[in-house]
Amino acid sequence: MNTIQRRAVMVLATGLLASAAFAQTAPVKVGSKIDTEGKLLGNVIALALEANGIKVENKSALGNTKIMRSAIIVGEIDIYPEYTGNGAFIFGEETNVAWKNAKAGYERVKTLDLAKNKIVWLEPSPANNTWTIAVRKDIATANKLKTLEDLGKWVSGGGQFKLAASAEFVERSDALPAFQTAYGFKLKPEQILTLAGGDTATTIRAAAEKTSGVNAAMAYGTDGPVAALGLVIMEDTKSVQPIYAPAPIVREEVLAKNPKIKTILEPIFKALDGATLQALNAKIQIEGQDAKKVAGDFLKSKGLIK
């Protein structure tokens, strides 16, 4: 081998070593949605990975579902917490009954996302953070409203109703439109206060404080402040909503480079049942604690990080 060949080999070897080093040190980009629980779970993931020696870039509170999906598909983020029931909307399968069953919904979205987008769904939490509507307790009591069927009849009969919600909840076919179809009511534009961001902390507070005449709010099944702020969740007796179990989803190539992500996160999400998420969300929404602090305190209390 002559001098020129040796130099070429050395340059190539140096380049390969540099590429390998970059692959090993490139941070895992952790994202999350902009709502309270999104911020909480995004920080849970970021802190847990970091505590176990995985370098991360925390990009929590990035945006809504559409933004997060686009970001993970193009590689702007590598991992974020998503909900199994959103598979119905993401893959245009709103009529598939699988989404109403926790196990079937998880298996369906896991299969679809891996095949179509090379995105891996890790094991979900046992919680169900389904979309719902919460009404001020004084209104619910006075009008005997316990279910969405009761609410639909009351609204259709001329009940004074105004809902605070995100644009996503109002526009998505599997959210407010699905409730209206199933329970036989139709809100006029003036009966909806659309709030930017999509955080249920904002919609619930708007109902509690009667902002612009609002007396009901878009809420999630694991929202902490619903009862504390004097609202009552309307029961979805027709099971309109899918099961929304939170789970970490990660780009396949990133998981291949960092396989311990799976073993780190699965016991953590298993510990995040509905009651636990409600309590953690309440610390953020009612007590005003920082989402990162709440996430860290939870992980430490469970002995999941030091």
Residue ranges and their predicted role:
Residues 19-23:
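Sec/Tat signal peptide C-region and signal peptidase I cleavage site
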Residues 36-55, 177, 181-183:
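Short, polar/charged alpha-helical segment
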Residues 47-48, 66-77, 93, 182, ...:
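Short helices/loops that flank or line small-molecule/ion binding pockets
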Residues 36, 58-70, 167, 188-205:
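Short helix-initiation/N-cap motifs at beta->coil->alpha
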Residues 27-45, 61-64, 168-171:
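Extracytoplasmic "Venus flytrap"
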Residues 39-44, 54-83:
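Extracytoplasmic small-molecule ligand-binding "clamshell" domains
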Residues 84-177, 181-185, 189-198, 209, ...:
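Contiguous mixed-secondary-structure segments that line small-molecule binding/active-site clefts
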Residues 6-10:
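N-terminal export leaders
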